[in-house]
Regions:
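Duplex nucleic acid-engaging cores and interfaces of nucleic-acid transaction enzymes
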Residues: 1-218, 222-224
């Protein structure tokens, strides 16, 4: 299902984004040029798109808009999203911190005031406890892997040349990861970990209930029935 959603993502109706506003300013050709990473003078190319009437005041704004478009393009790339999904599944760390000033009131969550562990190894009862602490505004929770390695994975996919255009794409990759891909993947990990924890909790409850229902109602006592 996630893979299908990735394929549909570029065509999904969306609210106004930084990339869509940059496109409205006519900066998409510049973004496409940068993505090709040809040996061009980036500032000279960007200067051609400076247009105060369209809201592009200088070269920096032209390049920023182009990077916004590139960032959205990378975020909507199905292959990149699948790589990030697998990376998060294998390497995400669930971290819990107490809100400053909530230490005394949130004592029942004291075990999670300063806690972290690999998400894939976290037992369901711990995940659910941390989520409750977050919902009750005692804990801050995040589910993230090491950032540098994630960015390196994206750079291996999208960086094709060591030149000024490639440097612009690198900047767009970092922005894409921090602003778009990482929050999206974290949301997925939250949903998946919640579903897994709920299913495990239900399974434990069902087993305990089965034992209770199958137990002798009067304990180990002899019972005589006469018909």
């Amino acid at each position: 299902m996630a893979a299908l959603e990735d394929i549909y993502l570029p065509y999904k109706p969306k609210r106004k984004t930084r990339a869509s506003m940059a496109r409205e300013k006519g900066l998409e050709p510049l973004a496409n040029l940068l993505l090709k990473q040809q040996p061009v003078d980036v500032e000279t190319e960007a200067a051609a798109y400076v247009n105060e009437e369209k809201g592009v005041k200088d070269i920096d704004e032209a390049l920023q808009g182009a990077r916004d478009i590139i960032a959205e393009t990378i975020n909507e790339n199905a292959e990149a999203r699948e790589k990030m999904r697998k990376y998060f599944q294998q390497n995400a760390i669930i971290r819990s911190r107490v809100y400053t000033g909530k230490e005394e009131e949130g004592q029942k969550y004291k075990d999670y005031f300063e806690w972290e562990e690999p998400l894939k190894d976290a037992p369901s009862h711990r995940v659910l406890a941390m989520r409750r602490g977050e919902a009750e505004l005692f804990l801050m929770l995040d589910i993230l892997p090491p950032e540098e390695e994630a960015i390196t994975i994206l750079e291996k996919q999208f960086i094709e040349a060591n030149n000024s255009a490639g440097e612009q794409v690198k900047l767009a990759i970092k922005d894409c990861y921090k602003r778009l891909l990482s929050p999206s993947m974290e949301t997925e990990m939250r949903m998946l970990s919640k579903k897994k924890a709920d299913e495990e909790a239900i399974e434990v409850f069902a087993k305990n209930l089965h034992k209770l229902l199958m137990a002798a109602p009067l304990g180990s006592k002899r019972v005589l029935a006469i018909d």
